[in-house]
Amino acid sequence: MAPRSSTSKSATREKKDHKKAPIKKAIAKKDTKPTPTKGKAASASTTPVKKDVTPVKADTKKKIHKTKTMKETVSDAKKTVHAAAGDKKLSKKRPAKEAAKKAINPGKKAAAQPKSTKKEVKKDNKTAKKETKKDHKPAKKEAKKETKPAKKDAKKSSKPAKKN
């Protein structure tokens, strides 16, 4: 009867295996249910949207760095203005001044205005120098014109004398 008992034991083992198998299937069914929740993961996708919000905050920090670069551009614009001070063309200075005025903070504009008045004084001096130069040049041209017609008159008077 021992073999029968062994078969009965194997039968009970098989029954136990069958009992365990449905439990695994139930777990498998639970695994299939979370897949629709993964499909519902729009709620989970909203959490990465919150992560996307944090890089926007990082962008605002980058804007703070941009203000630092704007200060550097103002200093560069001032350097170009000083470098152009030796140039005769004033049109090259004006765009740099306007760019500097736009970039400077309103508190700094008050400090920048006296500098602009000093530069206007320099412009007035240059225009005065140009006017004096213009006054001298026409005087020289008039003197030359007066001498040339006198020579032409002398030649004309001599030529008809030869023809006669």
From Swiss-Prot:
Location within or outside the cell: Nucleus; Chromosome
UniProt feature, compositional bias: Basic residues: 16-27
Entry function: Histones H1 are necessary for the condensation of nucleosome chains into higher-order structures.
Gene Ontology cellular component terms for the protein in this record: chromosome; nucleus
Protein species of origin: Tetrahymena thermophila (strain SB210)
UniProt biased composition (Basic and acidic residues): 49-61, 69-89, 117-156
Name of encoding gene: HHO
Main localization, broad class: nucleus
Region of interest (Disordered), residue spans: 1-164
TM annotation in the entry: none
Biased amino acid composition, Polar residues: 1-10
Keywords on record: Chromosome, DNA-binding, Nucleus, Phosphoprotein
Name under which the protein is recorded: Histone H1
